[in-house]
């Protein structure tokens, strides 16, 4: 193991929501450590607070108790600008601003900084547009004219505009047909490797999970009940795990779990002094 500090460290996290006049505890003493270059997939049943964990890492939710540290800093204290340059987030509905062109959507966070000249901002946005496999001709299209896969790509480019070392993905293949989902997975895999990103992904799609993960973490009973390869996770005798991996959709998973997980992305920062 490396002595590098973790990219994400969640320590004894309590997430509590107020509903109908009472406190609902979503996470209780949840611990999770994510190291540089990992692509960790978080799985759990509905109501297990998977997206809440992503929002905690983004600083959009504040821990009721415990600590969420991202790149050495309390997530909740990063502020919007600090967060954008450190953490990119692809929300499930990858909503683009409908009144802006694709290129202007991608450039959005850079524009808000108001520190760069306009032509430079558009140049940077164009580089990101190409990086996610869109064509220069797509730059001036409006979101309404895009396929679902193109919307995801544009939203991904927007999340990566400030070169954050950490990328959060919420159900990245949801709503895509199988062909588009496969293509988007391939894109995520190559970006993870080429950019040396650390990625945290929430998904309930087994193909996406087994294709991309370097590690799988299972949230149940308000904390992480298992973490490791698919085979290691499936060896845990937990009802949710059995249902998830071996239920209806999981019939083929038992064949797939023999497949090893991907290694973490090679980190260029390892060569720095």
Regions found by a protein language model. Give the residues of each.
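Conserved catalytic motifs of ABC-family nucleotide-binding domains
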Residues: 163
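Conserved ABC ATPase "signature" region
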Residues: 119-137
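ABC ATPase NBD coupling module
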Residues: 75-88, 112, 119, 233-236
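Helix-to-loop junction immediately C-terminal to a conserved catalytic motif
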Residues: 58
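Conserved ABC ATPase signature
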Residues: 142-146, 150
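Catalytic Walker B motif of ABC-type/P-loop ATPase nucleotide-binding domains
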Residues: 167-170
């Amino acid at each position: 193991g490396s002595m590098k500090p973790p990219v994400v460290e969640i320590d004894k996290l309590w997430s509590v929501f107020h509903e109908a006049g009472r406190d609902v505890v979503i996470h209780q003493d949840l611990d999770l450590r994510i190291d540089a270059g990992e692509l960790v997939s978080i799985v759990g049943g509905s109501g297990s607070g998977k997206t809440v964990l992503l929002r905690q890492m983004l600083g959009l939710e504040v821990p009721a108790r415990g600590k969420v540290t991202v790149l050495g800093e309390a997530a909740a204290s990063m502020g919007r600008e600090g967060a954008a340059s450190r953490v990119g987030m692809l929300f499930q509905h990858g909503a683009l601003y409908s009144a802006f062109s694709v290129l202007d959507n991608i450039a959005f966070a850079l524009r808000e900084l108001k520190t760069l000249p306009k032509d430079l901002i558009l140049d940077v946005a164009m580089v990101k547009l190409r990086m996610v496999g869109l064509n220069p001709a797509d730059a001036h299209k409006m979101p309404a004219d895009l396929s679902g896969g193109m919307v995801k790509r544009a939203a991904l480019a927007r999340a990566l505009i400030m070169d954050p070392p950490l990328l959060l993905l919420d159900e990245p293949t949801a709503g895509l047909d199988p062909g588009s989902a496969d293509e988007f997975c391939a894109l995520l895999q190559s970006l993870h490797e080429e950019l040396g990103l650390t990625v945290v992904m929430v998904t309930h799609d087994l193909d996406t999970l087994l294709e991309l993960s370097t590690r799988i973490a299972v949230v149940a009973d308000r904390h992480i009940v298992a973490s490791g390869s698919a085979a290691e996770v499936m060896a845990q005798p937990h009802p949710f795990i059995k249902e998830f991996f071996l239920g209806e959709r999981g019939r083929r998973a038992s064949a797939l779990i023999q497949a090893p997980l991907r290694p973490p992305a090679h980190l260029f920062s390892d060569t720095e002094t």
